[in-house]
């Protein structure tokens, strides 16, 4: 579903991924230099978040309030908001979802599912438990029957497992993109009808802004298409090598003032 409302003479777009682009996972904070850069950009640019998160969820809303973006490409392009208005949304095909759940259920080494309404609907929850405990020291999820997912409104799914398994899933289901996370221990599973890049295109259409007047920052493979599509695509210094190769420019890492340094390099702000 898409709402069309063209606005003229809007400011150029600067788009940011959240995790390990703005938000440093080492201490779960946004560096001061990045926050200062966002504040300087605000006067002359439209600030967009393009993320695999649902920024309206209780898990992410504090970050949204801290960053104060003009628009958000949520859940890898399956939901787009401008202010509090949803201008586009796409729900995962239910029959395809059933097929993916059945496929993953036969592989005990991986897990696939989604989190909806405070519950986590995953096959092989022990895989998710181990993944979360290894990364964060604990797993606080509330697991539920994954076969209930097709009865719910789901926009994207998540894969927990290694890169080989993610590639196999992508080959088995050509209708989806399986984009590995930066740590290569999991991936977003998104229907090809939606992506961060398509979200950027839809926002350009909404605001009547040419793609050439956009800048996109990212660090992982779910940023690949938006970095390639934007007028200027920027990979963080901590980004995956494939993304660095695709980018127009590689800046410093998230914890080394990468956001600020790239914005200064391209003349978006002055020190």
Residues of each region from the PLM?
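Non-catalytic pre-domain segments flanking phosphatase-related domains
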Residues: 1-16, 36, 40, 209
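Mg2+-dependent phosphoryl-transfer enzymes with acidic/Ser/Thr/Gly-rich catalytic loops
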Residues: 9-13, 31, 187-271
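Asp-based phosphoryl-transfer active-site loop
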Residues: 12-27
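Short, acidic loop-to-helix structural element flanking the phosphoryl-transfer center
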Residues: 27-45, 89-96, 105, 137-139, ...
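Active-site phosphate-binding/coordination module
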Residues: 32-128
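Short active-site oxyanion
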Residues: 44-48, 68-70, 154-157, 212-214, ...
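Short, structured coil segments at secondary-structure junctions
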Residues: 65-68, 76, 172-176, 229-230, ...
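Conserved acidic, metal-coordinating active-site core of Asp-based
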Residues: 103, 107-226, 238
């Amino acid at each position: 579903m898409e709402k069309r409302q063209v606005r003229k003479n809007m400011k150029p777009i600067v788009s940011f991924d959240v995790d390990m682009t703005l938000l440093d996972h080492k201490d779960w904070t946004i560096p001061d230099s990045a926050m200062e850069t966002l504040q300087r950009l605000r006067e002359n640019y439209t600030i967009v978040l393009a993320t695999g998160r649902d920024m309206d969820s209780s898990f992410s809303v504090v970050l949204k309030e801290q960053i104060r973006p003009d628009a958000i490409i949520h859940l890898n392009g399956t939901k787009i908001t401008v202010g509090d208005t949803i201008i586009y949304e796409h729900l995962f095909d239910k029959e395809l979802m059933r097929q993916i759940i059945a496929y993953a259920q036969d592989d005990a080494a991986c897990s696939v599912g989604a989190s909806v309404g405070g519950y986590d609907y995953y096959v092989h929850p022990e895989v998710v438990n181990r993944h979360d405990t290894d990364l964060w020291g604990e797993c606080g999820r509330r697991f539920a029957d994954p076969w209930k997912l097709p009865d719910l409104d789901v926009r994207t799914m998540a894969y927990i497992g290694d890169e080989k398994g993610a590639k196999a899933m992508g080959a088995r289901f050509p209708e989806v993109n399986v984009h590995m996370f930066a740590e290569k221990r999991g991936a977003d599973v998104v229907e090809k009808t939606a992506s961060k890049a398509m979200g950027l295109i839809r926002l350009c259409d909404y605001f009547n802004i040419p793609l050439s007047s956009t800048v996109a920052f990212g660090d992982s493979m779910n940023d690949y298409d938006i970095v390639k599509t934007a007028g200027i695509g920027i990979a963080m210094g901590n980004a995956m090598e494939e993304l660095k190769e695709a980018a127009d420019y590689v800046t410093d890492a998230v914890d080394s003032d990468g956001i600020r340094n790239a914005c200064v390099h391209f003349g978006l702000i002055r020190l």
